[in-house]
Amino acid sequence: WWDPQLEQEIKRCGNNNHLLAFHICDWKTPTTDMLFDRGLMGEGCIPVKQIRSWVEAAGFNGFNEVEIFSNTFWKEDQEEFLKKIIEAYREHG
């Protein structure tokens, strides 16, 4: 999302059969930690749906893996966190 060549790089990887996984989270701004303050889809500035469309157009048809490193979310009830993930994915993923 921050790389101006991202769409072209995704296409290149797809053309070479190198799209093996698609990990999803969002980047919160401002962030409190470079690794452990990721957000649910829709909480930050990453255009997840747009990137997903590029990945799928490049031939990826595997699972979308939600991967949210977050000290805040890890402290929550994980059943409730899972519900939030599902809701955010349906709306913004």
Name each model-derived stretch.
Residues 1-93:
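Histidine-acidic metal/acid-base catalytic patches
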